[in-house]
A protein has these predicted regions:
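Short, surface-exposed secondary-structure edge patches
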Residues: 67, 87, 101-105
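Short, conserved beta-strand element in jelly-roll/cupin
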Residues: 69-71, 80-97
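A generic "binding-loop/recognition-motif" signal
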Residues: 72, 83, 102, 118-119, ...
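Conserved short histidine dyad/triad with adjacent acidic residue
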Residues: 53-54, 66-81, 116
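Short acidic-glycine-tyrosine-enriched beta hairpin
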Residues: 101-116
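A short, N-terminal "cap"/entry segment at the start of jelly-roll beta-barrel domains
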Residues: 3-62, 77
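Ligand-binding loop in jelly-roll beta-barrel domains
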Residues: 96, 116-139
């Protein structure tokens, strides 16, 4: 699969070997473990993290692929990524994304990308759970 950009002279080519080379499987909703973690990155309250795939299923280039739930007034504190990137895809709820100290409103459908060497965080500023997919890729 090749992804081309309108910018000249570059493209991103994702080789099948980027992903796990073994036979793929699946995980069923309700059968995955959900872990509660308090004060992540020094943030207020707690998060609920559901690994959508386990470490042995992620391959060499992916460190985490999880669904994260932030209850109202809870946050995933500011943290930095070194040697990896992290992407958030907001599924539902409202919050405030911390992009290297700059607050950006977050809502369903938004995608946030934290590049290698940068820092970020997320706070639920709404009245319902803020739910997003988090993907960490190793450089």
């Amino acid at each position: 699969m090749k992804l081309f950009c309108t910018q000249p002279f570059w493209y991103v080519k994702i080789e099948p070997s980027f992903f796990k080379q073994e036979e793929t499987g699946m995980t069923k909703a309700g059968e995955r473990e959900v872990v509660k973690a308090e004060h992540v990155g020094g943030g207020a309250g707690f998060i609920m993290k559901e690994a959508l795939l386990e470490a042995q299923e992620l391959g060499a280039h992916c460190r985490m692929f999880s669904k994260v739930t932030l209850p109202p007034n809870c946050e995933l504190g500011h943290h930095e990524h070194h040697g990896e990137t992290e992407t958030y895809y907001i599924l539902s709820g409202n919050g405030m994304y911390d992009d290297n100290g700059k607050a950006i409103p977050a809502e369903a459908g938004d995608v946030f990308y934290c590049k290698d060497g940068d820092g970020h965080g997320m706070k639920n500023t709404g009245t319902e759970d803020l739910i997003f997919i988090a993907l960490i890729l190793k450089m």
